[in-house]
Amino acid sequence: MQILLANPRGFCAGVDRAISIVENALAIYGAPIYVRHEVVHNRYVVDSLRQRGAIFIEQISEVPDGAILIFSAHGVSQAVRNEAKSRDLTVFDATCPLVTKVHMEVARASRRGEESILIGHAGHPEVEGTMGQYSNPEGGMYLVESPEDVWTLNVKNEGKLSFMTQTTLSVDDTSDVIDALRKRFPKIVGPRKDDICYATTNRQEAVRALAEQADVVLVVGSKNSSNSNRLAELAQRMGRTAFLIDDAADIQEAWVKEAACVGVTAGASAPDILVQNVIARLREFGGGEAVTLEGREENIVFEVPKELRVDVREVE
C-alpha cells in the first residue's frame, strides 16, 4: 500500500497564532486562562490546552472578575466584545486576522447603510461573530448557504447591497452561490479579494491533487471543523472513499485493506503529530514509506499580541 501526503496540510497561520496566544498566556499568567469557545476546532489541541489550565467557556458570565479571557480564532460579535469590556477582565483576541478582515468589511457596510449578505454555515461560531458586526437598523444582514437560499431572499434595497463569505467554505460551492447572487442582485458588490482564506483554498487544491492518485483519502480533523469537513466532501465528490478522523485510532483496517494507495491530509486546525500517528497506523496495515506530494509553499506568519511575545521556554 502506497501512502501519499497532501501538501500543504495541517496548521495554518491563524491556528498557529491562536494556539500560541493561549500557550503564552498560560506561561505568563498561569492557570486558569479562560477561552471563549474552543480556541480552534480540534479535539487534540483543546484537550492538550485544557490539561495545561485553559478553561473553555461559551458565556462571558462564566468568567470570574479579574480573570484572563481569550477570544477564539473564529472571532466574536460586537455584543460579546462589549460584554467583555464591561467586566473587570484582561482580554486577548485570538481571532484570525483573515476573519477580522471580513469583520471589517461588514462593519464598513453597516456604517454606510448597505445591506450585507454573508455566505456561510448557520450556527458556526465564525458566522455568528461575523453577523454580529452589523448594527445598522436601517439596513440588514442576511445569511445564505446555497443558491436556493439566494433565490428566496428578499432585501430592502437591491441598489445598496454587498456580500462576504465565511473563510472556511468550499471554493466550488461558494462560487455557485456567488454566481446566484450576481444573477439575483446585479448591483451587488463583493470584496476586492476573496474572503475564503489562503489556507482553505490551498488545502482544497492539495486534496484535489491527492484524490487524483489515491483510492482512499483520510482527512485528519475534528467533526466540528468546517475546513476539515470540506476536504472530506471534496474527495468524495471526486469519487473517492473519504473518512474524517480525529486520530489514528479511528482508522479501521477494512477501510484500507484493498487500497493500492491511501492519501492523507489534515485540516487547518490539526497538528502534524496526528498525521504522523496516522502514517504509523497505516504502516501497521502494510503501508510503505509516506511520500509527500508537491504543493504550494506557505510562509505566512501572524504575530501574537505584543504583550504575549515571549519565549515560552524561558518563562517555564
Swiss-Prot record:
<keyword id="KW-0411">Iron-sulfur</keyword>
<feature type="binding site">
    <location>
        <position position="225"/>
    </location>
    <ligand>
        <name>(2E)-4-hydroxy-3-methylbut-2-enyl diphosphate</name>
    </ligand>
</feature>
<feature type="binding site">
    <location>
        <position position="124"/>
    </location>
    <ligand>
        <name>dimethylallyl diphosphate</name>
    </ligand>
</feature>
<feature type="binding site">
    <location>
        <position position="74"/>
    </location>
    <ligand>
        <name>dimethylallyl diphosphate</name>
    </ligand>
</feature>
<dbReference type="GO" id="GO:0051745">
    <property type="term" value="F:4-hydroxy-3-methylbut-2-enyl diphosphate reductase activity"/>
</dbReference>
<feature type="binding site">
    <location>
        <position position="269"/>
    </location>
    <ligand>
        <name>(2E)-4-hydroxy-3-methylbut-2-enyl diphosphate</name>
    </ligand>
</feature>
<comment type="similarity">
    <text>Belongs to the IspH family.</text>
</comment>
<keyword id="KW-0004">4Fe-4S</keyword>
<dbReference type="GO" id="GO:0051539">
    <property type="term" value="F:4 iron, 4 sulfur cluster binding"/>
</dbReference>
<feature type="binding site">
    <location>
        <position position="74"/>
    </location>
    <ligand>
        <name>isopentenyl diphosphate</name>
    </ligand>
</feature>
<feature type="binding site">
    <location>
        <position position="226"/>
    </location>
    <ligand>
        <name>dimethylallyl diphosphate</name>
    </ligand>
</feature>
<keyword id="KW-0479">Metal-binding</keyword>
<dbReference type="GO" id="GO:0046872">
    <property type="term" value="F:metal ion binding"/>
</dbReference>
<feature type="binding site">
    <location>
        <position position="227"/>
    </location>
    <ligand>
        <name>dimethylallyl diphosphate</name>
    </ligand>
</feature>
<feature type="binding site">
    <location>
        <position position="124"/>
    </location>
    <ligand>
        <name>(2E)-4-hydroxy-3-methylbut-2-enyl diphosphate</name>
    </ligand>
</feature>
<feature type="binding site">
    <location>
        <position position="269"/>
    </location>
    <ligand>
        <name>dimethylallyl diphosphate</name>
    </ligand>
</feature>
<protein>
    <recommendedName>
        <fullName>4-hydroxy-3-methylbut-2-enyl diphosphate reductase</fullName>
        <ecNumber>1.17.7.4</ecNumber>
    </recommendedName>
</protein>
<keyword id="KW-0414">Isoprene biosynthesis</keyword>
<dbReference type="InterPro" id="IPR003451">
    <property type="entry name" value="LytB/IspH"/>
</dbReference>
<feature type="binding site">
    <location>
        <position position="167"/>
    </location>
    <ligand>
        <name>(2E)-4-hydroxy-3-methylbut-2-enyl diphosphate</name>
    </ligand>
</feature>
<keyword id="KW-0560">Oxidoreductase</keyword>
<feature type="binding site">
    <location>
        <position position="124"/>
    </location>
    <ligand>
        <name>isopentenyl diphosphate</name>
    </ligand>
</feature>
<feature type="active site" description="Proton donor">
    <location>
        <position position="126"/>
    </location>
</feature>
<dbReference type="GO" id="GO:0019288">
    <property type="term" value="P:isopentenyl diphosphate biosynthetic process, methylerythritol 4-phosphate pathway"/>
</dbReference>
<feature type="binding site">
    <location>
        <position position="197"/>
    </location>
    <ligand>
        <name>[4Fe-4S] cluster</name>
    </ligand>
</feature>
<feature type="binding site">
    <location>
        <position position="226"/>
    </location>
    <ligand>
        <name>(2E)-4-hydroxy-3-methylbut-2-enyl diphosphate</name>
    </ligand>
</feature>
<feature type="binding site">
    <location>
        <position position="269"/>
    </location>
    <ligand>
        <name>isopentenyl diphosphate</name>
    </ligand>
</feature>
<feature type="binding site">
    <location>
        <position position="225"/>
    </location>
    <ligand>
        <name>isopentenyl diphosphate</name>
    </ligand>
</feature>
<comment type="pathway">
    <text>Isoprenoid biosynthesis; isopentenyl diphosphate biosynthesis via DXP pathway; isopentenyl diphosphate from 1-deoxy-D-xylulose 5-phosphate: step 6/6.</text>
</comment>
<feature type="binding site">
    <location>
        <position position="41"/>
    </location>
    <ligand>
        <name>dimethylallyl diphosphate</name>
    </ligand>
</feature>
<feature type="binding site">
    <location>
        <position position="74"/>
    </location>
    <ligand>
        <name>(2E)-4-hydroxy-3-methylbut-2-enyl diphosphate</name>
    </ligand>
</feature>
<feature type="binding site">
    <location>
        <position position="41"/>
    </location>
    <ligand>
        <name>isopentenyl diphosphate</name>
    </ligand>
</feature>
<dbReference type="GO" id="GO:0050992">
    <property type="term" value="P:dimethylallyl diphosphate biosynthetic process"/>
</dbReference>
<feature type="binding site">
    <location>
        <position position="226"/>
    </location>
    <ligand>
        <name>isopentenyl diphosphate</name>
    </ligand>
</feature>
<comment type="subunit">
    <text>Homodimer.</text>
</comment>
<dbReference type="GO" id="GO:0016114">
    <property type="term" value="P:terpenoid biosynthetic process"/>
</dbReference>
<comment type="pathway">
    <text>Isoprenoid biosynthesis; dimethylallyl diphosphate biosynthesis; dimethylallyl diphosphate from (2E)-4-hydroxy-3-methylbutenyl diphosphate: step 1/1.</text>
</comment>
<keyword id="KW-0408">Iron</keyword>
<feature type="binding site">
    <location>
        <position position="225"/>
    </location>
    <ligand>
        <name>dimethylallyl diphosphate</name>
    </ligand>
</feature>
<feature type="binding site">
    <location>
        <position position="41"/>
    </location>
    <ligand>
        <name>(2E)-4-hydroxy-3-methylbut-2-enyl diphosphate</name>
    </ligand>
</feature>
<feature type="binding site">
    <location>
        <position position="227"/>
    </location>
    <ligand>
        <name>(2E)-4-hydroxy-3-methylbut-2-enyl diphosphate</name>
    </ligand>
</feature>
<feature type="binding site">
    <location>
        <position position="227"/>
    </location>
    <ligand>
        <name>isopentenyl diphosphate</name>
    </ligand>
</feature>
